[in-house]
């Protein structure tokens, strides 16, 4: 499954660039105030002065909504890069063959309450590691 996602991600990223003007990214970013808070969004752009991100997924199952674990990843990336919105893009496949002509997309808005929880958990973990 991971190999399929790695193979499809550049293709989907090109689609995201063409449709949504978000550039593909493989860069590793750190939060302004905490160099150990890291994120690797799949796409980064500045639209009208605001940072926007993209996160690309492939799945063998239909989604009624974005899985919570992916939402946490998105909120974390928004925190690290100071973004307010992320375009979550996913391609469903059946036996590794895409089921639709185009990927599905949903915008996820920044949620500072969720980000606060995630930052607290990360800081606790880093504190334990520094002991």
Which residues fall in each region the model found?
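Nuclease catalytic cores
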Residues: 1-9, 13
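Nucleic-acid nuclease catalytic cores
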Residues: 2, 15, 19-130
């Amino acid at each position: 499954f991971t190999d399929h996602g790695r193979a499809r991600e550049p293709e989907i990223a090109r689609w995201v660039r063409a449709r949504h003007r978000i550039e593909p990214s493989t860069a590793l970013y750190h939060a302004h105030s905490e160099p150990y808070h890291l994120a690797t969004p799949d796409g980064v752009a500045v639209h009208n002065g605001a940072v926007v991100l993209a996160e690309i997924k492939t799945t063998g199952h239909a989604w009624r909504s974005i899985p919570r674990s992916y939402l946490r990843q998105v909120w974390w990336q928004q925190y690290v890069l100071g973004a307010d919105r992320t375009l979550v893009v996913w391609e469903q496949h059946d036996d590794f063959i895409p089921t639709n002509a185009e990927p599905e997309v949903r915008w996820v808005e920044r949620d500072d309450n969720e980000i606060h929880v995630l930052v607290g958990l990360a800081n606790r973990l880093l504190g334990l590691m520094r002991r």
